[in-house]
């Protein structure tokens, strides 16, 4: 599970892509799950595997990412990796092609649209169930914030309708177990149900929304592994805050879990490797506030006494650090700050970006850079009318 210490650093994306290429080429990894929306990434999955939107090049494909922050996936490094992955796949039989899937929970309305489309083509008698859920959400004009706010004032919600839809789509999809589009529809139903729960809890300021989101991503990993079979091997691309084991940070004190912790707990016997990234200084692509346009921002030298400061003084050059079985050494077992930069970054508040971390328990390996540069976005989008609410911890 190679992760990243920011959502806007060229070296993290570039080297994660190179690392993933080698694992695919040399060790037979068969799918990639990312911190992105399921419907958007399903279009990418079809494209890299040789079906759907084949008239588009990779830049046209990524231009369809519209939800802020678009630069997380619509950037030059992702474009180069996906172009390589498609070329790799098309040289192989259909059954040996590597998939690309979104793990996140945010695509409520897009997922509902995909469910309705699939039911219309495959189970028209079930369309009324989907339309009932759609009509419940209809008054909120595809604005999850309006829906979430309404549940604070009136206890009624769309929970019952969306859960009933999930049960029905699951049942229909099981009848077509080998059908990729049925699996897509079932996963969209899982997204819709969890997204409704996520927004309803988040608007109350409850940090449990973080756990709902990370449980959804871990559950999606499990569903992918089951669907793709026991011989499948998966890579997970997410932020350090999701992949680095929460039990080795102060998140555990606040009752928060994350994907890395859940996958370790569920699949330790199957072989799980959590790989972090870190750097000393450089620049990053991020926004100054939630929902605003991105810009290139400076990343100052690591804070004194942090893990990054220690690595800068001890190494002074890029390195790959693989932690062995004995992790009781003074650095690996020390509680020090570990920098985490999200999609929102304010260098003047740099001290807020350090998470108390026991490095040897949080990761199995760490890729270290002295100097980094900002990602190159493929396009610049104006901010949406109203962006997604921030999660807690913020910015990830």
Region roles according to the model:
Residues 1-396:
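Structured catalytic-domain cores with a bias toward divalent-metal coordination
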